[in-house]
UniProtKB/Swiss-Prot annotation:
Major subcellular site: nucleus
Record's GO cellular component terms: INTAC complex; integrator complex
Gene behind this protein: INTS14
Protein name: Integrator complex subunit 14
Gene3D superfamilies: von Willebrand factor, type A domain (3.40.50.410)
Residues annotated for Mg(2+) binding in this entry: S10, S12, T86
Domain of life: Eukaryota
Length: 518
């Protein structure tokens, strides 16, 4: 996921730090040292990450737009000027703007805020922003929570004792709370020095920027792979005591299925699957950035000569038009597939399904899927002209039924008019009349629209009084009976008000023959 590094360049960051030796350091130098360490790590282990650099004091400035060139980011660190007072709110507004312009509101993003814990003074300070948080309108809302999925990591160029001597730590913790609790505050353990700054940024790297390495297995074939971006733990909301589910480092392929059968399923996240080549000594090659082009070319040549199952799988899925179902954990599956990046380039991707025994209803339970050879006859037909999917559900789903929709008044009016039209054609339309009447009755009970039942009952009684002398005698009996049944249902308390109860035609001497047909 993209990263925005937000660097504090206010005057408070120029405060000197007493470090052993003759060279004098400022807090901004310690911050730049820590960020250099972070950028070097990402250049080696997280080089697909897009990163932007923002500096701020009372205003904010985008120093480096989203890039994968970490040399540019490191150069920008040495070219930062010093400005005036701290205004964290303006920096957070800037982060919102640049992320939404580049990635929209759906892509998760990590924000690394580097500051010394000084909150600013007067209007625009973090204290003032938090104090007026509940008094704002929609036009000038506080930028947290971010309008996109995010994690906010605050790197403080101060130790815990210094922050606790004021209310700085409480205010910074409030920022994490406002971001829905997504994020963490890091402080320097012990005195301010380069070693302790490295230790603090090392904790951030371990938490958020450690590459996810796994072993992809299919039978006796295996391949070491990196999954990018790193899969996040998934929490099932329905559980009473939810425990985050983490995918296994052993990704075992359990089967293959046609792309047409799996279609475009709902997924939690999508990830690149990159092969990690190993030389004879067991060291990784081809995954990092080397300083010398010749060394890099020779490493790539070595990696290209070693057979790799990941490459074989990618090519096979692309040619055969299939996807591989992969086991991520207990009752948790995903799929591996080839996705075209351009006309000539494609990538091996992995999508994660929701945990559960039946993540895709049209495939049924994953444990019940098996090879074609186990079937008595080929489920795809001899000419590959049919498919066993989608499985037909035992119970009709709600969207497969003729549901009653009364979003607009015209829908309700149409249903009532249909009943009245059939009422005027009784007894010939007895079956249709009661079918439409019961449909309206069930919908009214489901919506709690009991007044509608009484209103339709009054209409039917009125229709009964307007029957011509030439009308069949059975029509009056049926209308009166239907009106009485609706009035009983409109009370909501009688046995006739049950949802599953149906109004049946009244048995009369005139309707005997028609009742038998019904």
């Amino acid at each position: 996921m993209p990263t925005v590094v937000v660097m504090d360049v206010s005057l408070s960051m120029t405060r000197p730090v007493s470090v052993e030796g003759s060279e004098e350091y400022q807090r901004k130098h310690l911050a730049a040292h820590g960020l250099t360490m972070l950028f070097e790590h990402m250049a080696t282990n997280y080089k697909l990450e897009f990163t932007a650099l923002v500096v701020f004091s009372s205003l904010w400035e985008l120093m480096v737009p989203f890039t994968r060139d970490y040399n540019t980011l490191q150069e920008a660190l040495s070219n930062m000027d010093d400005y005036d007072k701290t205004c964290l709110e303006s920096a957070l507004v800037g982060v919102c703007n640049i992320v939404q312009q580049e990635w929209g509101g759906a892509i998760p993003c990590q924000v690394v805020l580097v500051t010394d814990g000084c909150l600013g003074i007067g209007r625009g300070s973090l204290r003032h922003s938090l104090a007026t948080h509940n008094q704002r309108g929609e036009s000038n809302r506080f930028p947290l929570p971010f309008p996109f999925p995010s994690k906010l990591y605050i790197m403080c160029m101060a130790n815990l004792e210094e922050l606790q001597s004021t209310d700085s730590l409480d205010c910074l913790e409030r920022l994490i709370d406002l971001n829905n609790g997504e994020g963490q505050i890091f402080t320097i353990d012990g005195p301010l020095c380069l070693k302790n700054v490295q230790s603090m940024f090392g904790k951030l790297i371990d938490l958020a920027y450690t590459p996810f390495h796994a072993v992809l297995k299919c039978g006796h074939l295996t391949a070491d792979v990196q999954v990018f971006p790193r899969p996040e733990p998934f929490v099932i909301d329905e559980e009473i005591d939810p425990i985050p589910k983490v995918i296994n480092t052993d990704l075992e392929i359990v089967g293959f299925i046609d792309i047409a059968d799996i279609s475009s399923p709902p997924v939690l996240s999508r990830h690149l699957v990159l092969p990690i080549a190993l030389n004879k000594e067991g060291d990784e090659v081809g995954t990092g950035i080397t300083d010398d082009n010749e060394d890099e070319n020779s490493a790539n040549q070595i990696a290209g000569k070693i057979p790799n199952f990941c490459v074989l799988l990618h090519g096979s899925l692309k040619v055969e038009g299939m996807v591989a179902i992969v086991q991520l954990g207990p009752e948790w599956h995903g799929m591996l597939y080839s996705q075209a990046d351009s006309k000539k380039k494609s990538n091996l991707m992995m999508s994660l399904f929701e945990p559960g025994p039946e993540p895709l209803p049209w495939l049924g339970k994953m444990v019940q899927l098996g090879p074609i050879s186990d079937a008595k006859e080929n489920p795809y037909g001899e000419d590959d002209n049919k498919s066993p999917f989608p499985l037909q559900p035992k119970n009709k789903r709600s969207y497969a039924q003729n549901v009653t929709v009364w979003i607009k008044p015209s829908g309700l009016q149409t249903d009532v008019q249909k009943i009245l039209r059939n009422a005027r054609k009784l007894p010939e339309k007895t079956q249709t009349f009661y079918k439409e009447l019961n449909r309206l009755r069930k919908a009214a009970l489901a919506f709690g629209f009991l007044d509608l039942l009484k209103g339709v009952a009054d209409m039917l009684e009125r229709e009964c009084t307007l029957l011509p002398d030439t009308a069949h005698p059975d029509a009056a009996f049926q209308l009166t009976h239907a009106a009485q049944q609706l009035k009983l249902a409109s009370t909501g308390t009688s046995e006739y008000a049950g949802y599953d109860h149906n109004i049946t035609p009244l048995q009369t001497d005139f309707s005997g023959s028609s009742a038998e047909r019904i």
